[in-house]
Amino acid sequence: MASETALFFPPKQQPLLIRLVQSVSYLVLQRLYRCGLVVSDDDVAKLRAIAGARVVYVCNHPTMEDGMVLFSLAARVGQLWHYIVAKESFKGLQGRFLQWMGCYSIRRGLGDRASIAQTLSLLKESQAQVVIFPEGGCSYQNDTVMPFRSGAIQMPLQVVAQLTKKDPDVDLYVVPISLKYRYTQPMTVIIEETLQGLERTLGIIPTEPEDFYQRLLAIASLVITRIETEFGITADTEQSWNQRIDQLRHHGIAQCEQQLNLQPNGAPIRERVYKIQALLESEEPKTVAEDDALYWTTVRLLNFDAIYDGYVAADPTPERFLDTLMRLEREVYQVEHIKPKAHRQAIFRVGEPINLKHYVKDFRQDKASTVERLTEQLRATVQENLSR
């Protein structure tokens, strides 16, 4: 097994190269990612106003394109940021490029001491600016925020508590950033084509072709039933869809942990999945087929982690329809990542920066309670601004 040091990729920030890449980031975002950037002048000014301080940016993580979008936001603000990125992204030239851009790795689901130490070290530097996705991974949900992991607030609180022993007036801000996407064209035809593709593959003939929502429900119902059959679960017609989905999640994670002789630890399923993926990457494989099957189960678990019945019905926007349809495509077509269906706008809203020096006294008196309170405050702010 590789040493912990070998499993960590530190940042190797190259400022001149970053400025060069930032200068073309708008074009790259438009051409390669089919995405435009929307952020108000007031929000840009809000970020620039604290440019000379230590800052942690916490942002929700709805899609796999968020990293590039945040890099473009840094370019818009005119700043150089560091980014915490999942270790599996650091492969070959791409990995080196990420390091040059100021990214460093984290092994999700494990206590990655090297990554934590890097974050603590960076935040002790003046003008350090670090981006963290506190949900821990991609939610695939445009309008809802998953629970935040406490480390995003605990680490900067720990640093500011140390720094204020020498300088009581030291500033260290945490800034809640909300990110959502909007398609820039009518999506009716694309939704119709996506429904047709899934129906064709699953052998479904729609009884109400004009009712997109009922067609979505029919597809989802068959997909859930198929997974239940695969897992050997007898469907209980008295259960709600959310109960059935939750049962599938718990069955899937238990199956994975049993294969790896892991004891359930009560952590959220997403954290347990990341631990399994990290172990699959670092340990000697049993057989390729066994590891591939186990990895695919973890992908399915992440795909369905944040989904719930009612997400589309509550607000049937094109974005919510396609959030759900793309989840179903990943399951039916067995594809881990699906590209956006059309050009979108990435819309940022920046919350009021929180200066952690004002919470040092509380942190010293009751670390756990202070971290929990601020973590939930940040999550609620991101969700509130997302819903505006």
Where are these regions (language model features)?
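Membrane-interfacial terminal anchoring regions of lipid-handling membrane enzymes
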Residues: M1-E65, L73-Q79, K87, R113-A114, ...
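ATP-grasp fold ATP-binding core
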Residues: V130-G136
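Hydrophobic alpha-helical segments in the ANL/AMP-binding
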Residues: D66-A75, G92-F97
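Short, basic, glycine/proline-bearing loop/turn elements
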Residues: R31-L32, W100-R107
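Membrane helical hairpin/interfacial module
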Residues: L80, I84-F90, Q94-G95
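Short glycine-centered, acidic/aromatic-flanked micro-motifs in structured strand/loop junctions
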Residues: C59-N60, R108, P134
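Domain-scale detector for complete catalytic domains at protein termini or as standalone homologs
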Residues: S25, F97-L98, G102
